[in-house]
Amino acid sequence: MKIQYSLLLFLLLLGFTQCKSPAAKEDRLSDDALMDTVQRRTFNYFWEGAEPNSGLARERIHIDGVYPENDQNVITSGGSGFGIMAILAGIDRGYVTRQEGLERMEKIVSFLETADRFHGAYPHWWYGDTGKVKPFGQKDNGGDLVETAFLMQGLLAVHQYYINGNEKEKALAAKIDELWHGMEFDWYRNGNQNVLYWHWSPNYGWEMNFPLEGYNECLITYILAASSPTHSVPAACYHEGWARSGGIKSASKPYGYPLELKHNGAEEKGGPLFWAHYSYIGLDPRNLTDQYANYWNVVRNHAMSDYQYCVTNPKGYKGYGPDCWGLTASYSINGYSAHMPDNDLGVITPTAALSSFPYTPEESMAALKGFYKQGSWIWGKYGFYDAFSPNEKWTVPHYLAIDQCTIAPMIENHR
């Protein structure tokens, strides 16, 4: 099903199958059944694991119940946007009914109508029981334009899913329109500069000082800003800000795969793989081009270079190979880290390969089978745990929304 909204092409290719039992042996499962198994469990992170008052995604779910920051009821805007698109996949896969999906979305939108918002942008985190902002950092206690763009990407997909339905479904779409029209992208130019800014705080103003320049996960923010019917920004913001007046172009070719765009802070070998996922869950990169790059090549080559790096395994970590690859930001042996070739700590994050299914179907399927064969030490209630180290035989039974919630919709985009 192609979902188009204004200048955006939101793509969810949705089919109908029954999910097979997750307890089935991998060698008895077809590729489709194995994808069903993983989609169903990761879908449940957002469905069964949602914070009950808001219906939104918890920032993290720790199966062992250990929450050092006492943040088990903190919810996330960006991760929820990914989870919202997982609901659409879940409806058409038969995990929940269309009516159940509608009721969950009504709860979510009702929460968003009254939750803390700053010139149309939501914070990175809220307290789920109150809708009040939970600071992400000392000065990061206001609007987060990028995380809101990820959330709105999901809401617009839901808008198109229900817009031609019954009266309740049309009413939901109308409420989403109001949230969409309220996003003040023009405010986040910080005084009409030709660039968007990531943060604004009612207490600290623009002190975070993070302009959205150069290639990372943020493309969808500029696409939405350009297509806003109420608070759009001029093309100069994209060209001078995001594209750095042409400075975004790259000649780097790790393992023979041209990156085409300079990855911020990782220009030679490429950044963490979530950069190839977050903006493209709803935005179809096929045939998406501008004067700087072909975005299908950008995301596919990023994934393939990451795959080839792990297969080549220059640091000699145990376990790396064609069926065990994928570097991205996740939990790590010591805290949290943005894993990538220039920051390879021997930690594999399953979402890196699994959310790359649209770009690397054969390589991602090999990884899926390889992860599944490893068994219960990395597999739990909501699918594969956030990260593991085959070299150190390390994992923890922890999940993060921004990793888990991309898997089901990106596998669906592939299917």
Task: Provide a role label for each language-model segment.
Residues 24-415:
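Ser/Thr/Asn(+Pro)-rich, low-complexity disordered segments
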Residues 1-26:
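Bacterial Sec-dependent N-terminal signal peptides
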